[in-house]
Amino acid sequence: MNKLALYCRAGFEKETAGEITDKAAQLGVFGFVNLKENSGYIIFECYQAGDADRLARELKFEQLIFARQMIVVGDMLQDLPVEDRISPIVAQYQALNPRHSSDIFVETPDTNEAKELLTFCRKFTVPLRNSLKKQGWLTKSERAKGSIGLHILFVRPGCCYVGYAYNDNKSPFFMGIPRLKFPAEAPSRSTLKLEEAILTFIPEAEEKKRFTDEMTGVDLGACPGGWTYQLVKRGVFVYAVDHGKMAASLHETGRIEHCPEDGFKFQPPKRKTIDWLVCDMVEQPMRISKLIGKWLINGWCRETIFNLKLPMKKRYQEVQLCLAYLEEELEKQGFWFKIQAKHLYHDREEITVHIAVMGKR
């Protein structure tokens, strides 16, 4: 097994390929990509034996923007016999001898064609899990040091990749997709983007400390209030900045102040440090990056989650430019900070970025 399979949003295979090639090279790992447009996954094949496993251990999954999941795989199994699909899969795993495995996930790429296999995947999981347990596998806790999850990626009927991922360096979600329910009282479906961002960027154990009823937030381009809703739900008082109207349900909470102003010109009230800045405005990504940079450098906010709408072409390059700009500006000013970006499931032609400022040198 010396390949990586990376799941992604259909249509973002080239961005995923460019990113894994760059990140692998930074670790001294080289290889080549096999991809099919709109397939929802790519294969990165390493030149050196053992390098795929090294990437799965050392390349921090949270650093990858476009990948939803990262697993080590071997050659594709093709034309699995209908009467016995399990034996060829078990045979591939026997070479690995995954005694430190915790569970099995039988998945597909996130495309309409592949998802037709999901019913089969669910039914197939039970007998496959039983067979793997008979081998003495799937016995470890997913929290055990060095434990792995076993993953099967079915790309079409009878054809799959057999692989694994390290539990401490992968998405915990089936197919790399968090299943979020749209809250009936939320003003717009965009609320799921911020909910997924919080789930992705903020450790669950820290969430109640990072969002409290003593905190203040600003939502630039807030109308009708999908993102404001997520902050208010967590107790934060929000200055909702938008010329448009906010949902009446948010006004009724008493936890927002509507500021009918231009998001690019708004400044926080004097002597008021904003704990959270959020922004989902439709604007050129570099213009948004400069706006966010201004807020952070001026000390107007401590932490921010914002979206960057991507151009039709050179999307990965645009992301690199925007993130490099923000990192350089913050470093120039002597800030200690953490920056993460992710192409979330609920994002479309955009990525979501999180920056937390921890202090100054």
Curated annotation (Swiss-Prot):
Protein name: Ribosomal RNA large subunit methyltransferase M
Keywords tagged on the record: Cytoplasm, Methyltransferase, rRNA processing, S-adenosyl-L-methionine, Transferase
Pfam families the record matches: FtsJ (PF01728), RlmM_FDX (PF18125), RLMM_N (PF21239)
Residues the entry annotates as binding S-adenosyl-L-methionine: 190, 223-226, 242, 262, 280
GO biological process, one term: rRNA processing
Record PANTHER family: RIBOSOMAL RNA LARGE SUBUNIT METHYLTRANSFERASE M, RIBOSOMAL RNA METHYLTRANSFERASE FTSJ DOMAIN-CONTAINING PROTEIN
NCBIfam families: PRK11760.1 (NF008734)
HAMAP family, per database record: 23SrRNA_methyltr_M
Cellular compartment(s): Cytoplasm
Reactions mediated catalytically: cytidine(2498) in 23S rRNA + S-adenosyl-L-methionine = 2'-O-methylcytidine(2498) in 23S rRNA + S-adenosyl-L-homocysteine + H(+)
Function per UniProt: Catalyzes the 2'-O-methylation at nucleotide C2498 in 23S rRNA.
Active site per the UniProt annotation: 309
Gene label: rlmM
EC category name: transferase
InterPro entries assigned: RlmM_FDX, RlmM_THUMP-like, RNA_MeTrfase_FtsJ_dom, rRNA_MeTrfase_M, SAM-dependent_MTases_sf
Homology family: Belongs to the class I-like SAM-binding methyltransferase superfamily. RNA methyltransferase RlmE family. RlmM subfamily.
Documented EC number(s): 2.1.1.186
One GO term describing the cellular component: cytoplasm
GO molecular function: S-adenosylmethionine-dependent methyltransferase activity
Subunit structure: Monomer.
